[in-house]
């Protein structure tokens, strides 16, 4: 049977694309190979968001060519085929992000499909995450025009899925053991705008392609629902009642990017120091236990020490639960590249280190507030007898902290258990099964 090697790079949205490609390949009768040597062809799903990601993608393509020789490239970097051909002219085919059919066509040119999918039962969806959690993509593309970002050029304008289609996928996942649904998009709050928030039928029930209505129906499935990448203004307030009612996890991933109003204007992003703090205060009044994650860019062109200090002051006062930080990296094709006053690399790195040092203090302070409390933990791993590693509502897989739990030895992966917190580190918690 024909074997395909597969490498998936980039964000959770790219991971969903990889799962779709692998599921379709499985339906056509292909097997996946864990090694380059055993595979008859390798697919590389690339990332092209920042220069470091581009370089990593090009290096992986080169490695696959060296070890295997037959490579099909897809994903965000595939939207810039000249970049790939310049370094690796021998790749078999290049497709852009989300172009599943073109990937399948490219594979079948080299390796004809082992079977006719119309004559066989379609196998279950291939998942690249553990069985108990899954990413569900609500939309593709983005209509925002942030000056530092080229996602609209790579992935196109906003294209939302019908609500019934999303709910059907979520229901299938929950029926097969998924305990946590992580909803992803470039901007979840824009979901359905391109569809005019039209209705579709889920069973015999009409559901609007609008985030609040979708979530209200999805909550009936009983899984944890976690939201990633929600534009900060103005839609967050509409989602808070669902969190207060326990229908959606009280967790928000809101990329604020900066706190200096001047820098945010250059980024073409909304808000600033005062408006950010006002919004956070209003959200926490509705959902006091709300966990907030955000990402920030330091060293953006024109960022002065004063601008950076505004960001530090904001983080001290905002007390965000989780923070990611990037030193600004010029992305080929981004409008921000034309801005004057670039920040020297050593200054970018120094500011990044200062921000992380401050946030580490904030994170420890926040974590220590949970000592003595009992939290619900979703078990991810059982590394040894009597020990479990899991996550609370505050922790998204792979990017946030974890909870190390002393257990009675009977818990299973995917189970939700009460845990009494005994100790807190900067990013992680330690406790005992209650």
Swiss-Prot record:
List localization entries. Cytoplasm
Binding-site positions, [4Fe-4S] cluster 2:
142, 146, 149
**MTTase N-terminal domain: residues covered:** 2-112
Q: Which reaction does it catalyse?
A: L-aspartate(89)-[ribosomal protein uS12]-hydrogen + (sulfur carrier)-SH + AH2 + 2 S-adenosyl-L-methionine = 3-methylsulfanyl-L-aspartate(89)-[ribosomal protein uS12]-hydrogen + (sulfur carrier)-H + 5'-deoxyadenosine + L-methionine + A + S-adenosyl-L-homocysteine + 2 H(+)
**EC numbers, comma separated:** 2.8.4.4
- Residues forming the Radical SAM core domain are 128-365
Group of enzyme by EC = transferase
Domain (TRAM): give its ranges: 368-434
For this record, the Gene Ontology CC terms, alphabetical, are: cytosol
Cited HAMAP family: MTTase_RimO
Its function, per the record, reads: Catalyzes the methylthiolation of an aspartic acid residue of ribosomal protein uS12.
The UniProt family comment states: Belongs to the methylthiotransferase family. RimO subfamily.
NCBIfam families from the entry? Answer: 30S ribosomal protein S12 methylthiotransferase RimO, MiaB/RimO family radical SAM methylthiotransferase
Q: What is this protein called?
A: Ribosomal protein uS12 methylthiotransferase RimO
Which organism does this record belong to? Thermus thermophilus (strain ATCC 27634 / DSM 579 / HB8)
Q: Which gene holds the coding sequence for this protein?
A: rimO
């Amino acid at each position: 049977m024909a074997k395909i090697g597969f490498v998936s790079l980039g964000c959770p949205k790219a991971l969903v694309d990889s799962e779709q490609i692998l599921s379709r390949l499985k339906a056509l009768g292909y097997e996946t190979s864990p090694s380059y040597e055993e595979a008859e062809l390798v697919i590389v799903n690339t990332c092209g968001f920042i220069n470091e990601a581009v370089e990593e993608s090009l290096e992986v393509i080169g490695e696959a060519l060296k070890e295997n020789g037959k490579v099909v490239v897809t994903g965000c970097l595939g939207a810039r085929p000249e970049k790939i051909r310049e370094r690796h002219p021998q790749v078999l085919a290049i497709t852009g992000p989300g172009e599943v059919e073109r990937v399948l066509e490219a594979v079948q040119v080299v390796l004809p499909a082992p079977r006719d999918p119309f004559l066989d039962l379609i196998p279950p969806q291939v998942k690249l995450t553990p069985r108990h959690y899954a990413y569900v993509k609500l939309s593709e593309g983005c209509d925002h025009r942030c000056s530092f970002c080229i996602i609209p050029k790579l992935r196109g304008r906003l294209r939302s899925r019908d609500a019934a289609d999303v709910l059907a996928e979520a229901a299938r996942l929950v029926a097969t053991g998924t305990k946590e649904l992580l909803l992803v998009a470039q901007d979840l709050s824009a979901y359905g705008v391109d569809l005019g928030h039209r209705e579709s039928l889920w069973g015999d029930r009409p559901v609007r392609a609008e985030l609040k209505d979708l979530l209200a129906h999805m909550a009936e499935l009983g899984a944890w629902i976690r939201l990633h990448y929600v534009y900060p203004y103005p839609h967050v307030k509409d989602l808070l009642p669902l969190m207060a009612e326990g229908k959606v996890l009280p967790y928000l991933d809101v990329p604020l990017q900066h706190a200096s109003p001047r820098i945010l204007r250059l980024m073409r992003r909304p808000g600033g120091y005062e408006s950010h703090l006002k919004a956070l205060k209003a959200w926490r009044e509705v959902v006091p236990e709300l966990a907030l994650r955000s990402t920030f860019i330091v060293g953006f062109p024109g960022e002065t020490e004063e601008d950076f200090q505004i960001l530090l002051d904001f983080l001290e006062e905002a007390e965000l639960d989780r923070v990611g930080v990037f030193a600004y990296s010029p992305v080929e094709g981004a409008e921000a590249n034309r801005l004057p006053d670039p920040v020297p690399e050593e200054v970018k790195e120094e500011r990044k280190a200062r921000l992380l040092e401050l946030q580490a203090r904030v994170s420890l302070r926040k974590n220590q507030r949970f000592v003595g409390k009992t939290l619900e933990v979703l078990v991810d791993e059982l590394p040894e007898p009597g020990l479990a590693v899991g996550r609370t509502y505050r922790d998204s897989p792979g990017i946030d902290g974890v909870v190390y739990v002393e257990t009675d030895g009977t818990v299973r992966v995917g189970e939700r258990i009460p845990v009494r917190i005994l100790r807190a580190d900067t990013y992680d918690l330690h406790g005992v099964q209650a």
